[in-house]
Amino acid sequence: ATEGFTAPADGVIARSAEATVILDLDGDRDERTGWVLFFFHVATEGRIAEGVEVKKGDLLGFPSCEGGRSTGTHIHVARRYNGEWIPAAGPLAFVLDGWVAEYSGIAYEGTLTKGSKVVPACRGCARAENQIIYTLPE
């Protein structure tokens, strides 16, 4: 992939191995405490090293098909708080740059919504309307 993905917040890389990057937001380097962001299907080449302190917008790596079965190059992002996975949708919805995750009740069948734009999840597709690429403001 030519488009890398960047840190959505300041933190420190608690783990970087085997298609995974863990961004620790409280900076204690312990992914079992506080908020952490989990990125999966991260390419080995260009992946940020463990222990690096990052600022919002710093390059973390590149989407890939590494780390298991995949129908195409992509990235997963999830979050944990004190070691517990926090659902993307619901009362504590995951919001990234105004995009709000919504769950349909079926795995991989949710949407991202920002204002009037709704982007449905789509298994195995590469339609332009299902791609969100964020550019940091200058």
Please identify what each model-predicted range represents.
Residues 59, 64-65:
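Short, surface-exposed secondary-structure boundary micro-motifs
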Residues 31, 61, 118-121:
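Secretory pathway export signals and precursors
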Residues 1-2, 6-50, 69-79:
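Zn2+-dependent peptidoglycan hydrolase active-site motif and core
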Residues 49-55, 73, 78-138:
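Acidic, glycine-rich catalytic/binding loops that coordinate metals and/or anionic ligands
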Residues 39, 54, 60:
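Short alpha-helical segments in extracytoplasmic peptidoglycan/chitin-binding modules
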